Amino acid sequence: MAIRKYKPTTPGRRASSVSEFEEITRSTPEKSLLRPLSKTGGRNNYGRITTRHIGGGHKRRYRLIDFRRTDKDGIPAKVAHIEYDPNRTANIALLHYADGEKRYIIAPKGLKQGTIVEAGPNADIKVGNNLPLRNIPTGTTIHAVELKPGAGAKLARSAGASIQLLGKEGKYAILRMPSSEIRRVDIRCRATVGEVGNADQMNIRWGKAGRMRWKGVRPTVRGVVMNPVDHPHGGGEGKTSGGRHPVSPWGHKEGRTRNPNRYSNNMIVRRRRPNKKR
């Protein structure tokens, strides 16, 4: 994926860059795999904001992605097109199965139009094929990994993400996550061979606030510039430091929020690199 940098003709263009979309082979999505996608503005059914910084954005339609592929074991599929998906950072691939059905999957790096892919325990170890972890050789790079057998892919689905299969111990596979965390996953879970494509997406510079608004992202305002009614750091005469340790708008201490006694902790072999905020 190449990135086009603009000449500084305006302040917004000065810092902007966009994808060349060279991998994309079709601009019109498959109509039968589209669903309406309504906007919430970050509100729940009571109309209260439950997620901040969400609102507006370009109208989208959701593309149905097959994250399981279990019911297509042994049925070969041809990659008809590589398409853009506005709902995720990765591109998607449209598969035409031999039985006539069409489905979308996450497009891995190197998957080309016309390639034949397959799912199932007996599938070859090649990019785009989906197999149980017990059938994948140690050291293989994989993506779209399940956390529970049959639940659908949950791990490594965004652009450029990949997981390495380090080994197998009894009924568990040992995986190195994109965060460098090493964890166990049930060996019956399925994964797709290869890494997710469109890795250069992380290098795109949005350049101006308006492009983020097109994506449905609203501004993030610092608490120290708010009024006392809006944030614990708000108020004061002139510019202040907030006057207390950093907290959320609801007064909770800033830092990690993961439950230290989470039920899945026993599946983590080694934590990710400890350079995060505590």
From Swiss-Prot:
Zinc is among the record's keywords: no
Bias (Basic residues) ranges: 269-278
GO cellular component, as recorded: large ribosomal subunit
Biased composition (Basic and acidic residues): 23-33
Entry-linked Pfam families: Ribosomal_L2, Ribosomal_L2_C
GO molecular function (one): transferase activity
Alphabetical UniProt keywords: Ribonucleoprotein, Ribosomal protein, RNA-binding, rRNA-binding
Positions of disulphide bridges: none
Biased composition (Polar residues): 258-267
Cytoplasm among keywords: no
Biological processes per GO annotation: cytoplasmic translation
Ranges where the record places region Disordered: 1-53, 224-278
InterPro entries named in the record: NA-bd_OB-fold, Rib_uL2_dom2, Ribosomal_uL2, Ribosomal_uL2_bac/org-type, Ribosomal_uL2_C, Ribosomal_uL2_CS, Ribosomal_uL2_dom3, Ribosomal_uL2_RNA-bd_dom
Record PANTHER family: LARGE RIBOSOMAL SUBUNIT PROTEIN UL2M (PTHR13691:SF5), RIBOSOMAL PROTEIN L2 (PTHR13691)
Family annotation (HAMAP family): Ribosomal_uL2_B
Role this protein plays: One of the primary rRNA binding proteins. Required for association of the 30S and 50S subunits to form the 70S ribosome, for tRNA binding and peptide bond formation. It has been suggested to have peptidyltransferase activity; this is somewhat controversial. Makes several contacts with the 16S rRNA in the 70S ribosome.
Assigned protein family: Belongs to the universal ribosomal protein uL2 family.
Complex and partners: Part of the 50S ribosomal subunit. Forms a bridge to the 30S subunit in the 70S ribosome.
Protein name: Large ribosomal subunit protein uL2
Organism: Corynebacterium aurimucosum (strain ATCC 700975 / DSM 44827 / CIP 107346 / CN-1) (Corynebacterium nigricans)
Organism phylogeny: Bacteria, Bacillati, Actinomycetota, Actinomycetes, Mycobacteriales
